[in-house]
């Protein structure tokens, strides 16, 4: 009987210390879609070199909100680094949105950024440039190699916890202290 993969959408992937790839080391990825064809998510703890004000200006969207202009944009992953992805908690019908899970949504359309600039956007939002993608079976293979922990998605972690605490904070949600893990075993 074939094994049916379980969808990891609405879960966080937490990179284990043994994952040394420069893009994903110590990263936390929110999985937005996962099926037999692959998976797509965004990193939620990697700062980019851009502010939201710079991104909005590039798109000819103006705002007088200094806090919004200064907000850090995250590096969402190596796929489509020129595209914006907004993780948020607002169920309104934006032009291009996907329900990730209970109270978590992914929007890729301009209308959400325009609403944010007018002060009418979601109460909580994380803007990323780029996303992460896994081909069919690739994520499952990485999980079997112990590259990632899986943790149920947590809006408080995604929106409120400081970036530098998200990696350990996500693992601690399931009782794991990443600083106590080793990537070897054997006899003395």
Curated annotation (Swiss-Prot):
GO terms for cellular component: cytosol. It comes from the Bacteria. InterPro entries: AlgH-like. Pfam families: DUF179. PANTHER family: UNCHARACTERIZED PROTEIN YQGE, UPF0301 PROTEIN YQGE. Belongs to the UPF0301 (AlgH) family. This is UPF0301 protein Smlt1098.
């Amino acid at each position: 009987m074939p094994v049916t993969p379980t969808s990891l959408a609405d879960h966080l992937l937490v990179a284990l210390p043994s994952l040394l790839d420069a893009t994903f080391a110590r990263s936390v990825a929110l999985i937005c879609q996962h099926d037999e064809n692959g998976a797509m998510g965004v990193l939620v703890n990697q700062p980019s070199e851009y502010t939201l004000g710079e991104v909005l200006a590039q798109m000819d969207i103006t705002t007088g909100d200094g806090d919004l202009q200064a907000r850090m944009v995250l590096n969402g992953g190596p796929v489509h680094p020129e595209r914006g992805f907004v993780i948020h908690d607002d169920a309104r019908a934006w032009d291009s949105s996907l329900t990730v899970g209970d109270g978590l949504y992914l929007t890729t359309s301009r209308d959400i950024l325009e609403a944010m600039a007018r002060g009418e956007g979601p109460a909580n939002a994380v803007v990323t440039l780029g996303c992460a993608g896994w081909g069919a079976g690739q994520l499952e293979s990485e999980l079997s190699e112990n590259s990632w922990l899986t943790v149920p998605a947590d809006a408080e972690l995604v929106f409120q916890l400081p970036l530098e605490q998200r990696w350990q904070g996500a693992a601690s949600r399931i009782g794991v202290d990443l600083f106590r893990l080793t990537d070897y075993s054997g006899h003395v």
